[in-house]
């Protein structure tokens, strides 16, 4: 059973890396909204984590907080600061893109494996969550290619919320809060 689970894990990880390498390439994404997202990360690192803090390049906050929540910039800043600057801001941004890419698939795989009891049964759903676009703001096309990275990260967190509630729903005595 454990050998079969390792095969499932390797198939999933291999597909995620292969597709991600083709989609994200080897360099920094520099089109659509990515330059602005990289700027937001530089802003979080150099000016501070408060996205509404006065900065002449921050566009007064309105559309920024509505369409570009600061979660992706905060994650990149956390990676940069946790490495004590060893991971530069552009590399931290690439790491955020890879996390945003794989998180929906991995989280869905974990949830479905828990619910269905089989990694093989969970694999198709995880592939759909990993590669789905269908004009979703958090899909591969808009979430990664266009640069709506925080939306993609949010999409990846949803299955983790459900996974955290499974034991409670199945009759545990209290909510996991």
Q: What are these regions, as identified by a protein language model?
A:
Residues 1-22:
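Start-transfer (signal-anchor) and selected internal transmembrane alpha helices
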Residues 6, 10, 46-49, 171:
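Generic structural signal for short, solvent-exposed loop/turn connectors between secondary structure elements
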Residues 164-177:
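Short hydrophobic alpha-helices at membrane interfaces in multi-pass membrane enzymes
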